């Protein structure tokens, strides 16, 4: 399984950052490849709740995935595992938020094992994803610090 780790410090309170990260409907506003995000489980997010994401595909088209919350500590941690994905494979992701002077540090880790014909390319793919994820958290930072989110 390959992984990608990215970090950013956002000049906003941890509660604000956590609220954005736990709302999948906001992802298309700050994540470049996100087209749609939605909660599949009624009520506030919690362990066991599920969300669906539609993202831009590698060669055009779209890819869809369903993820389940495996860990949720308010204003601290959000972890999810991949339940199903149109591209196959398995994965999990975790956001860890840390209050720092003047804001919030976000550490984001993705662990993924592509399926099918993509399996041999897991490490090169994660290098591409790492760059994309860093752009996304930088965009999240810019949007949150300008109060666009």
Kindly give the residue locations of the regions a language model identified.
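Glycine-rich portal/gate segments that line the openings of hydrophobic small-molecule binding cavities
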Residues: 38-86, 105, 112, 135-149
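Hydrophobic ligand-binding cavity/cleft-lining segments
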Residues: 1-41, 46-47
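Amphipathic alpha-helical segments that line or abut small-molecule/effector binding pockets
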Residues: 15-18, 134, 138
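Hydrophobic/aromatic beta-strand elements that line small-molecule binding cavities or substrate pockets
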Residues: 6-8, 39, 64-71, 91-99
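Beta-strand/loop substructures that line and gate deep hydrophobic ligand-binding cavities in soluble
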Residues: 81-135, 142
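Generic recognition of short, well-ordered alpha-helical interface segments
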Residues: 12, 29, 64, 131-135
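Alpha-helix N-cap/helix-start motif
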Residues: 30, 62-63, 90, 118
């Amino acid at each position: 399984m390959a992984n990608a780790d990215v970090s950013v410090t956002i000049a906003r309170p941890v509660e604000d950052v956590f609220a954005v990260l736990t709302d999948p409907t906001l992802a298309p506003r700050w994540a470049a490849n996100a087209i749609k995000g939605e909660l599949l489980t009624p009520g506030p997010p919690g362990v066991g709740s599920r969300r669906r994401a539609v993202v831009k595909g590698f060669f055009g088209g779209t890819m869809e995935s369903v993820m389940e919350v495996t860990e949720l500590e308010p204003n601290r941690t959000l972890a999810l595992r991949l339940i199903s994905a149109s591209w196959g494979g398995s994965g999990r992701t975790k956001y860890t938020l840390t209050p720092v002077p003047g804001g919030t540090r976000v550490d984001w880790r993705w662990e993924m094992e592509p399926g099918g014909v993509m399996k041999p390319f897991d490490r090169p793919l994660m290098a591409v994803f790492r760059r994309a994820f860093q752009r996304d958290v930088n965009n999240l930072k810019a949007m949150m610090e300008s109060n666009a989110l």
